[in-house]
Amino acid sequence: MSHPTIAHGPMTNPNDFRPGVYRHYKGNHYLALGLAREDETEELVVVYVRLYERAGVPMSTRRLKVWNEIVTDANGTTQPRFVFVGHQT
């Protein structure tokens, strides 16, 4: 399994973050609930829930700077790791 190439850029302003449904570059959808602060590092993390069936705990966190990364997939396509799809209704 190959891992994506990551282009590191400036961290997105936390005020620009929008809760809602996001599509991961591999195709799955997630509901981003909001931002939280990691207690030990004080880094901002996105709190989200996967919107597909899979064993295990459905809620996760991901560092905001990783959430906003630009990745290059195995086919050489460069794209955001997550793309905002819209608000959950």
Annotate each predicted stretch with a short phrase.
Residues S2-T89:
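Mixed-charge, low-complexity intrinsically disordered regions
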